[in-house]
Amino acid sequence: MAPAASRLRVESELRSLPKRALAQYLLFLKFYPVVTKAVSSGILSALGNLLAQMIEKKQKKDSRSLEVSGLLRYLVYGLFVTGPLSHYLYLFMEYWVPPEVPWARVKRLLLDRLFFAPTFLLLFFFVMNLLEGKNISVFVAKMRSGFWPALQMNWRMWTPLQFININYVPLQFRVLFANMAALFWYAYLASLGK
């Protein structure tokens, strides 16, 4: 085969890689929705922590290596908490407040912002405290100092994103949409943990 033809074939295969990856993701999403969302959430949560560490390292001009335990904590949190729980919460919301209900968009947003957001944040602080091996007094101290500022930041950042997510993003993609936005949110939360 001529070098030019070989190069064209490789370039064609590389261009089709995103399409194949998307097709594979959609297939997994169809047959294994909870597992697919859990794995996606775990990976993206760990990437959010990696982003936080890189930002902190650059700001402090720190030469230390990355903290692998932080990456693992966020991976575990996304894999076992955020991914599966979000899957079921979005299903619950779809069932409890169907789109045809009057004021459904507003009701869904209020349910998410006033109930789900504080609950998820409380769960985040609790699980991270456990994964860090810290006692309950450390958890209580973090809740006193960090919960309210984090919840206020959550409401500012997530309210427009969640309005779009819960009202316009197809149900099967809501966890992924939230996970993509959460890359930056987890970077913020990781900075609070320091």
From Swiss-Prot:
The protein's location, in the record's own words, is:
Peroxisome membrane
Q: Which residues lie on this side of the membrane: Peroxisomal?
A: 52-74, 135-172
Segments spanning the bilayer are 31-51, 75-95, 114-134, 173-193
Known InterPro entries for this protein?
Answer: Mpv17_PMP22
Complex and partners: Interacts with PEX19 and SIVA1.
Its function, per the record, reads:
Seems to be involved in pore-forming activity and may contribute to the unspecific permeability of the peroxisomal membrane.
Record family assignment: Belongs to the peroxisomal membrane protein PXMP2/4 family.
This chain's protein is named Peroxisomal membrane protein 2
- The species is Rattus norvegicus
